[in-house]
Amino acid sequence: MSDSPQTIQHNVPLAELDPDVARAIDGELARQRNTLEMIASENFVPRAVLQAQGSVLTNKYAEGYPGRRYYGGCEHVDVIEDLARDRAKQVFGAEFANVQPHAGAQANAAVLMALASPRDKILGLSLAHGGHLTHGMHLNFSGKLYEAIAYEVDPETMRIDMDKVREQALKEKPTVIIAGWSAYPRHQDFAAFRSIADEVGAKLWVDMAHFAGLVAAGLHPSPVPHADVVSTTVHKTLGGPRSGLILAKQEWAKKLNSAVFPGQQGGPLMHAVAAKAVAMKVAQTEEFRDRQARTLEGAKILAERLSAADTKGAGVEVLTGGTDVHLVLADLRHSELDGQQAEDLLHEVGITVNRNAVPFDPRPPMVTSGLRIGTPALASRGLDTAAFTEVADVIGTALAQGKNADVEALRARVSKVAEDFPLYEGLEDWKLV
């Protein structure tokens, strides 16, 4: 039987059907291989995650939950979603898990829908001091639908002062208190947040999107025993697909499930749910724990190098003097470089980071006076102590030399590290299997 036009089109490989997209994907693979990725919110997923996410599951609609779908033919995706939920609960010691959120922002929107009503007060870390858009930023849904109040870091220590958080909570009586962050290099005291929430009659929500992988490995205090609800992305330190996850006490299960579907979303992306299931299996391995340990070690090596005499002399400071997590915040307020210039300089060298506001930043958000530098992707790439030390020295030297940096020499050092730790060996351009 001859192929119909539709059958032919459905079996043509990407490079033949759409060479423009294929070339762009090839270019991105080359960029990831040949440069060093140090954006704190990015990571490299295992090839098995790529395979799951690029599977035929992208074809399947599955509104509802396992055993309670609004579509037929869900017997296989039910198995996958159950695996993802059960594994997530095992990894984090949680009573309840919802693996359907398309992204962290959708997870956070569902959490607020479940815990609060429109115009209720919510108390979270200021975006300008390391919080996230979804914690009450005025242009975000969280700042439009709810009365958002922000706590800030102490101007001297650059750390969260729990006594001041308590004072604000007692004064404002929020419905929800939010812990967690997007750019804060220290542990938070979840027990203290719980105590404050209980004192003022608030629910406690922790957004652990950035440090979930460290929690899973037992290398960071877990918010799960303290919080009513915990949300996270799966793609940062966890190293899974770009997507969201909600964990909670069982008492919140019904409200949270309803808030995700039909509250925030229709059908889940089952290819992403499958990739989450794979990521949760990986998170239970010794190799994963080793990777998280190297992530922390790399961040501490970087913080130490950026505290050296040459960088300090160039006006570079490490916010809070160090780090407890996977990222370092470099304060450039006294440097000749602003955040944009520093990001561009490191990009020329072959290291990808992002400019980031520091607390009390005098510069506009598109320029900033800081850099946020993370180590998860390099740990996933296999970097060891010596390699992290070399990368930290490249960054420290570049920031110390500033506009006089020897870009060519520094780029050669970066290229050597990239060659020594190859990425996705055997992956042929855009082909995922």
Curated annotation (Swiss-Prot):
Ligand binding ((6S)-5,6,7,8-tetrahydrofolate): L127, G131, H132, L133
GO cellular component: cytosol
Enzyme class of the recorded protein, top EC level: transferase
Necessary cofactors: pyridoxal 5'-phosphate
Enzyme Commission code: 2.1.2.1
Residues making up the signal peptide according to the UniProt record: none
Subcellular location(s) of the protein: Cytoplasm
N6-(pyridoxal phosphate)lysine carried by residues: K236
Keyword Kinase: no
Catalysed reactions, as listed in the record: (6R)-5,10-methylene-5,6,7,8-tetrahydrofolate + glycine + H2O = (6S)-5,6,7,8-tetrahydrofolate + L-serine
Pathway given in the UniProt record: One-carbon metabolism; tetrahydrofolate interconversion; Amino-acid biosynthesis; glycine biosynthesis; glycine from L-serine: step 1/1
SUPFAM superfamilies: PLP-dependent transferases (SSF53383)
PROSITE patterns: SHMT
Keywords: Amino-acid biosynthesis, Cytoplasm, One-carbon metabolism, Pyridoxal phosphate, Transferase
InterPro entries: PyrdxlP-dep_Trfase, PyrdxlP-dep_Trfase_major, PyrdxlP-dep_Trfase_small, Ser_HO-MeTrfase, Ser_HO-MeTrfase-like, Ser_HO-MeTrfase_PLP_BS, SHMT-like_dom
GO molecular function (one): glycine hydroxymethyltransferase activity
Sites marked Plays an important role in substrate specificity: H235
Gene Ontology biological process: glycine biosynthetic process from serine; tetrahydrofolate interconversion
Major subcellular location class: cytoplasm
Pfam families: SHMT
Subunit relationships: Homodimer.
Function of the molecule: Catalyzes the reversible interconversion of serine and glycine with tetrahydrofolate (THF) serving as the one-carbon carrier. This reaction serves as the major source of one-carbon groups required for the biosynthesis of purines, thymidylate, methionine, and other important biomolecules. Also exhibits THF-independent aldolase activity toward beta-hydroxyamino acids, producing glycine and aldehydes, via a retro-aldol mechanism.
Protein known as: Serine hydroxymethyltransferase
Organism: Corynebacterium urealyticum (strain ATCC 43042 / DSM 7109)
